[in-house]
Amino acid sequence: MKLFYGACFVLAAVLVVTSCNAGNDTVSGNNRASTAVDSNFFNRKIEGEITVSAYDSMSYRNFLEEAARAFEALYPGTKVNVETFSAMPEIRTGEQGGNQMMLVQMQDDPQGRSDFISRINTNLMSGTGADLYAMDVLPLHKFAGNGPLENLDSYMEMDPGFYRDDYRENILDAIRYRNGTWFLPLDYDFNYFTYDAALVPMQIGSGLGTEKPINAEDLLKIGMDLYDGAYKLFNLYDYSRSPRSMYNMLLSENIQSYLNLETKKPNFIDGSFAAMLNSVRDYGEQGLIPQGVTGQQDAGQLRQRMGAPTDRFYFKQYNAVSLQSQFTRNLGRTMRMVEGGMAAGIDSDDEIAGIEANADGSVPFSFNQGFGINSRSRNKATAWAFLKFLLSKEMQLSVNTLNIALPLNNEARTEKAELTFAGLFRNGGGVLNDQQRQALEAYQATVERLSDNINCYVVQDTSLNDMINQEAQYFFGGSRGADEVARILQNKADLYLSE
């Protein structure tokens, strides 16, 4: 039986990321930010009231409300208020062709995100902001450094109750930005590629694998040489308003050449952005990749793809959660996260081609949940204690965390994999047989090998994301040419970054 988690983000904005720290900003030496707390800070009694604010209700609300009640029970005399703002998505479950399905349909709301950011800015200026902020839509480049976020370096260094090696350390290294750590993710995600061993010759496939990052351009070059018209190169549609598509993949891998948040200089008009748009359209028109649809049709298209796949693709892109299927597919259980913009393909001969890298070779991660502390909070001690509580193994194993990312906590990541496999195989008492245990151990080892390559968190700005996504719709809808879109984006981004 296959369990498909369908995420159809109708009109969903691509998560554009625009500034990468590839691990060169270290904690030690002259780069260390000034210490914000001393050792006495951690002896304070955990008490009083704090507020946690997030935009995305689906990712945060249930989890935070559970955490708030548990934290209050652990620390009598505390109160944790939870604020979330976006509408909850429509969730439907069912069965199709023997496959269990869960379809999550979200309406994108650029204006809602903009209103939320404006509200946060107003609250911060008036001194009435929350104590903790989820970093789901807030622009880190505007909030870090001299902005309203607390530098957490000294908290992690001086707190005797915080153990850095409890977490994936290369993720903690990657999030350092402007000589500081301004938020902590609770989880992490990455993309990886597979190749179909029935289509890609062994001599080529042997050069791919878990140890070596690779980007889409490299795989497209390989695929072009092999292409014979019988099968398409990638399982991604040319364009979709959902986060997955060939356009979104190439944009994310190359965004740093189009936009530099540190210098506040956009670069959409040197020809490379327009060339990328035209190449994606050409791939679709030439039949090299599937051609997509837009708008509300995405949801229906996704439902059609939830059945048993009938097509093969030279290469496929997946997120980290789907990696489980690589090791359970021969045991009668698979779990794929099928997102809008993805075409389902036969995967019985798939082998791992590598973790996805940016065009410059850096290997990024994303996160589902992450939090920063308001530097003007009146109760930083309790805010920090709550953030540590969210990072604990117990909370990272909560059933209210969406299973779309890997826990940052090392013990939680190990245990969550075990629980997921036991649940997938419906074993009584959570005991796996030898074959299932081998699959679990192979999966865990592969997760860690791929994760070892991560060295970059690429800072994003949702307002710029929405600008780019809006103009891309005009191009793929046929109402504007690539050069016109590039010029408009150059002007819009330049105006926004100069504010």
List the model feature ranges, each with a label.
Residues R32-S34, D109-I117, L124, M135-F190, ...:
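Hinge/lid segment of periplasmic solute-binding proteins
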Residues C20-K142, E394, R480-E499:
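Conserved N-terminal structural module of periplasmic/extracytoplasmic solute-binding proteins
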Residues M249, E253, A274-A385:
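Extracytoplasmic/periplasmic substrate-binding proteins
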Residues L199, Y231, F389-T420:
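Periplasmic-binding protein-like
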Residues D153-Y163, L172-S245, E253-G295, S375-A381:
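Helix-loop-helix "hinge/cap" segment bordering the ligand-binding cleft or interdomain interface
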Residues F365, G423-L497:
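C-terminal capping/gating helix-and-loop segments adjacent to ligand/active sites or protein-protein/ligand interfaces
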Residues F63, A67, R378-L390, V485:
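Short amphipathic alpha-helical coupling segments at ligand-binding clamshell hinges
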